[in-house]
UniProtKB/Swiss-Prot annotation:
This is Kunitz-type serine protease inhibitor bungaruskunin. Disulfide bonds join 31-81, 40-64, 56-77. It comes from Bungarus fasciatus (Banded krait). The keyword Signal applies. The record marks 41-42 as: Reactive bond for chymotrypsin. GO terms for cellular component: extracellular space. Belongs to the venom Kunitz-type family. The keyword Disulfide bond applies. Expressed by the venom gland. Keywords: Disulfide bond, Protease inhibitor, Secreted, Serine protease inhibitor, Signal.
Length: 83
């Protein structure tokens, strides 16, 4: 194989390894929603999946409404959203 072909192959492999974790994220679509504290004022500690950081992070949940990217524990968030 020529050096140009090897460079192309190396470039494609590099691109594939960079994009694979994002495209293989098998969690539900709601795991990509931003954290939504809701309108209430109970100030509960909750966790949401941050797709940019690829991890579950803590936020303050007001106790009502919000969205489905809202978990009581980091473990539950990880179990649902990280595949």
């Amino acid at each position: 194989m020529s050096s140009g072909g090897l460079l192309l192959l190396l470039g494609l492999l590099t691109l594939w390894t960079e994009l694979t974790p994002v495209s293989s994220l098998g969690g539900p679509a709601y795991c990509k929603l931003p954290p939504e504290p809701g309108p209430c004022h109970e100030y509960k500690h909750a966790f949401y999946y941050n797709p940019d950081a690829r991890e579950c992070e803590e936020f303050i949940y007001g106790g009502c409404k919000g969205n489905k990217n809202n978990f009581k524990t980091r473990h539950e968030c990880h179990r649902v959203c990280v595949r």
